[in-house]
């Protein structure tokens, strides 16, 4: 939203951009189950999952190029008597291409990860490492706005241009390395007759523990999307530090990486569901501080001013660095970073642990259906998750606009009232935390513990007719 609706971006309507982003997600209703279903049925010499990742990567890259390295100029046009900005349909089609590529490559990728191990805690290690590398990529990308800030580029549109260009070069190299180095292991199946698509979807939703998981996943996704959609606008308009946004992202992502081993140890000790509950509580506690930061006077945060914190540096270094922040209120912003790092330390757990729990749930289906259908499960989960993200983005931007927020206002001489900015802070932090709290009663007494999973896997292994399904194509 900051690129397409921000005052330093394309200047489109925030509410309309949010609606377009939500609308594009409807394409996943068809593509997600279809890709998951086909991926489960595929047999090639390279495996079930790798061909889709190989095909989806260039589709995704093309979509990113069109979305962020815009080759056309947006303008008002008239078509069939309707006047609108060409930016809206352009956003829709380029984003739909991004989502299509992401579906083709990401769903088999996640299913592949679920099949790498059957061990309760080892699955958490796999998803934790995957999320850690994902956040590392986000961390590297977060340094881009910080670096180009010193080169005079402060707009979000500048940052995404350089990030997209770098990604288009690096992503194919890393993807190819993964496809060559990482193995696909044969899966164990009892039933060789393939289940039709519609029946396959029905069987997924008959898995009661998966439906329970989906409720948790959906509400958490809505909350996360609300926060992500409004993050830049909060920093720009409430903290009046939009030029420093890149400096916030880097430590925020770093806190997620550093905390992952802590959450893994807690998960191994108390179980994945209990650790997830702790993470939600930790997230909500620090989220409640955000509105207080928004309404507190700047004088309260003088101890966090850059010129105070960096006073120990040599004079030449000190003057060079401090001059870059001249005219910017850094005290409240740096205190905000501290709070967000504490809050962000829970994000790694909220990403890795549910994915590991999903891998466990698939074993319940394998015991019942006799087939390893990770693709179908991650496809349906991905479809619902994307829908939740789109809904959260739409709800977040709409609530902000309904509260009177104008994203095009000058932050230095804003027309947004104090009440409007406080409302923006609540929509950005407190309301998303409440959405995540919906998961608590569903996680309490979660039935799929380590002991229960071991029992289920023993039944799968010992069941009559169970055998490995090799990667070579077979009809």
Describe each PLM feature range.
Residues 1-475:
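Membrane-embedded alpha-helical bundles of multi-pass transporters/translocases
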């Amino acid at each position: 939203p900051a690129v397409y609706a921000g005052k330093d971006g394309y200047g489109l309507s925030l509410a309309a951009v949010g609606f377009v982003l939500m609308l594009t997600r409807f394409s996943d209703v068809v593509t997600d189950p279809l890709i998951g279903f086909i991926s489960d049925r595929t047999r090639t010499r390279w495996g079930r999952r790798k061909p889709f990742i190989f095909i989806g990567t260039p589709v995704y890259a093309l979509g990113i190029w069109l979305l962020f390295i815009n080759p056309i100029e947006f303008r008002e046009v008239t078509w069939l008597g309707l006047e609108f900005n060409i930016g809206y349909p352009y956003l829709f089609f380029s984003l739909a291409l991004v989502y299509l590529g992401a579906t083709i490559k990401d769903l088999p990728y996640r299913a592949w990860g679920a099949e790498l191990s059957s061990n309760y805690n080892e699955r958490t290690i796999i998803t934790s490492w995957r999320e850690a590398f994902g956040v590392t990529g986000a961390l590297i990308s977060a340094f881009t706005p910080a670096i180009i800030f010193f080169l005079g580029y402060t707009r979000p549109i500048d940052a995404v241009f350089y990030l997209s260009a770098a990604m288009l070069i690096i992503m194919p190299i890393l993807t190819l390395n993964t496809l060559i180095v990482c193995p696909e292991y044969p899966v164990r199946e009892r039933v060789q007759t393939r289940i039709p698509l519609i029946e396959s979807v029905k069987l997924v939703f008959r898995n009661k523990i998966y439906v329970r998981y989906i409720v948790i996943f959906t509400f958490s996704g809505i909350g996360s999307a609300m926060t992500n959609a409004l993050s830049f606008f909060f920093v720009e308009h409430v903290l009046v530090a939009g030029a420093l946004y890149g400096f916030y992202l880097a430590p925020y992502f770093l806190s997620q990486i550093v905390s992952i081993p802590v959450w893994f140890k807690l998960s191994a000790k108390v179980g994945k569901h209990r650790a997830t509950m702790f993470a939600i509580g930790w997230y909500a506690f620090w989220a409640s501080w955000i509105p207080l930061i928004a309404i507190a006077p700047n004088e309260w945060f003088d101890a966090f001013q850059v010129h105070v914190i960096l006073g120990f540096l040599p004079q030449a270094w000190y003057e060079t660095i401090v001059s870059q922040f001249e005219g910017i209120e850094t005290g409240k912003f740096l205190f905000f970073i501290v709070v967000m790092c504490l809050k962000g330390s829970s994000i790694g757990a909220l990403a890795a642990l549910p994915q590991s729990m999903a891998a466990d749930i698939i074993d319940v289906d394998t015991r019942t259906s006799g087939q390893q259908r990770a693709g179908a499960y991650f496809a349906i989960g991905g479809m619902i998750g994307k829908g939740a993200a789109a809904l959260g983005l739409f709800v977040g931007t709409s609530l902000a606009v309904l509260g009177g927020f104008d994203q095009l206002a000058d932050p230095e001489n804003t027309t947004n009232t104090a009440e409007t900015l406080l409302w923006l802070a609540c929509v950005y932090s407190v309301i998303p935390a409440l959405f995540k709290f919906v998961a608590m009663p569903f996680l309490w007494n979660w039935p799929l513990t380590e002991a229960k999973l071991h029992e289920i896997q023993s039944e799968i292994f010992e069941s009559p007719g169970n055998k490995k399904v090799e990667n070579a194509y077979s009809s």
